[in-house]
A protein has these predicted regions:
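Hydrophobic/aromatic-enriched cytosolic interaction surfaces used to assemble or bind macromolecules
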Residues: 1-221
Length: 221
């Protein structure tokens, strides 16, 4: 499916429209084009966000190469962990604050996805009549939104729960310090069942471990 969100930052009520488009993959492109036309959004800037299953994110040591060669060097560095060939992979990196890993040296987060998936998303957006600006990942989007919604000089935490998984982001001063997949499966059906109490306790333990790491190991307490 596709989550279609229309936002007007200049408006008193920025969120204009939100809906989920659920259909077969072969019909989604047509559905999106129809909704763009119905909402008179043709030509509006669009910021596409990849679904979590469309990419992998991993923490890596920054290679000692010129800035322009970092992405390609990291791509080769993580080749054995990729679910696709090097030729089929698209890898982008973003910095982790130096204060987060003083002992290890400079670290980066590397996001890897199939080139073909990038092309699919690009064509989907353009064929619907939208003006594609970027194709991003959820971590970057959450970071940007969180910075607009709350003061983060002391640190911000965001728990993203979907598809039975939970990912925690710890941010400070507009930068991601920690992105961690929590070792706890969460399903909406569990929240109303007897098993929720034990699942909730495991979730609390995982969260506390992450907060302790942020405060003690990263020195951000």
């Amino acid at each position: 499916g596709i989550a279609l969100v229309w936002v007007d930052p200049a408006s008193d009520r920025p969120l204009k429209h939100w809906e989920m488009l659920i259909d077969s993959p072969s019909q989604l492109a047509q559905r999106l084009a129809e909704r763009v036309e119905a909402l008179a959004l043709s030509g509006v800037p669009c910021y596409a966000v990849l679904a979590p299953e469309d990419y992998s994110l991993q923490l890596v040591e920054a290679p000692d190469v010129p800035a322009g060669d970092i992405a390609s060097a990291v791509k080769f560095q993580i080749r054995d962990s990729l679910a696709m060939s090097l030729a089929d992979a698209e890898v982008q990196v973003f910095d982790v604050p130096e204060a987060a890993y003083r002992q290890q040296g400079r670290m980066l987060y590397a996001a890897a996805t199939h080139r073909a998936r990038i092309a699919e998303v690009r064509d989907l957006v353009l064929n619907a009549g939208l003006a594609l600006q970027t194709i991003d990942i959820r971590e970057s989007v959450i970071r940007d939104l969180a910075g607009q919604m709350a003061e983060d000089s002391g640190g911000l935490a965001c728990l993203d729960v979907r598809g039975g998984e939970a990912r925690l982001l710890l941010m400070k001063a507009g930068e991601i310090y920690l992105s961690r997949q929590l070792n706890t499966e969460i399903d909406q059906s569990q929240m109303a069942g007897e098993a929720w109490a034990s699942t909730f306790q495991r979730l609390l333990v995982e969260l506390q471990r992450s907060f302790d790491y942020f405060e003690n190991q990263m020195g951000q307490g």
